[in-house]
Curated annotation (Swiss-Prot):
The gene is Eurl. InterPro entries: EURL_prot (IPR009704). Keywords: Coiled coil, Differentiation, Neurogenesis. It holds the Pfam family EURL. This is Protein EURL homolog. Expressed in brain (at protein level). Expressed in neural progenitor cells and postmitotic neurons of the embryonic cerebral cortex. Disulfide bonds: none annotated.
Length: 290
């Protein structure tokens, strides 16, 4: 076969774009996910991995992707089987029902004559509140001594919600930092402008203005000195703007990577390790073909 008749294979999918951040980059900086590769070597099946070998991207992007994916999926919960999880939930529910029924019957038998002052009956007459707390919270005892203490207590379910809200504040952290950075720089610029203006006011301003008559009346040395000051001021402003633009670009890039990673996690939720437990549980009910 002649050299002119030889075919060249072209990969149409090779567009030098990171699959995580969706930004164009050099081909040498792209590689497959090293975290999924190490998990595969440890024995994790390919169906449970987040990325395949065909997915290319930056090393930092893959690390941030797995960091976000592992925030809500702890290894302690993943190690439990489906039967253990269901057994724990059912046992908690049954124990809570038994405790609630026992406390309710004891209070009704001991204080049935005090209908107007009974905490349980007063609690039932408030339809805007829930009659039953969450099943995994501590069962309240409806007695005259314990009503004052239980009124201000917070259930463990509410505490977990508050902790979850504190952990998910990272989504607004970047925006707050950017806003604080902008307000800090703006206030600092105003302070420098106020301090630079002395008692004369018109001569030592940040951006002085000179008329044509004033410039014509200056000597050559004064004009050269004024030009040097203006060039120095322009250089300082340029460096400050460059620094602000670089910080803004870095914050925007990090925020973009987080948003793209969250969107892909929502789209590929079936591949998350925390959902593989339920999938294996449903497969166990299927009949096996011998």
């Amino acid at each position: 076969m002649n050299e002119e008749e030889q075919f060249v294979s072209i990969d149409l999918n090779d567009d030098n774009i990171c699959s995580v951040c969706k930004l164009g980059t050099d081909k040498d900086t792209l590689s497959f996910c090293h975290i999924c590769f190490e998990l595969n070597l440890e024995g994790v099946p390919k169906s449970n991995l987040l990325h395949t070998k065909s997915v290319r991207g930056h090393k930092d992007c893959f690390e941030k992707y797995h960091l976000i994916a592992n925030q809500d999926c702890s290894r302690s919960k993943l190690s439990k089987s489906t039967y253990e999880g269901v057994k724990t939930i059912v046992s908690k529910k049954i124990n809570w029902i038994v405790q609630y029924a026992q406390n309710k019957n004891l209070d009704l038998e001991s204080e049935c004559s005090k209908t107007s002052q009974h905490p349980l009956l007063n609690f039932r007459h408030k339809p805007e509140k829930k009659l039953l707390p969450q099943f995994d919270s501590q069962v309240p005892k409806y007695s005259a001594k314990g009503s004052a203490g239980n009124a201000g207590s917070i259930s463990s379910y509410a505490q977990r919600i508050l902790e979850h809200r504190e952990n998910t504040d990272f989504r607004l952290g970047l925006l707050e930092d950017a806003d604080a950075l902008w307000t800090h720089s703006h206030s600092q610029a105003q302070k420098t402008e106020e301090t630079s203006s002395g008692p004369e006011g018109t001569i030592q301003t940040q951006n002085p203005h000179y008329s044509r008559e004033e410039l014509n009346s200056m000597t050559l040395a004064e004009v050269v000195q004024l030009s040097a000051k203006l060039q120095q001021r322009i250089q300082e402003v340029f460096e400050e703007l460059t620094h602000q633009v670089q910080e803004k670009d870095s914050l925007a890039s990090e925020l973009h990577v987080r948003h793209v990673a969250i969107e892909q996690l929502l789209k590929n939720c079936s591949k998350l390790p925390c959902l593989q437990v339920g999938r294996t549980g449903t497969r166990s009910h299927l009949p096996m073909n011998h």
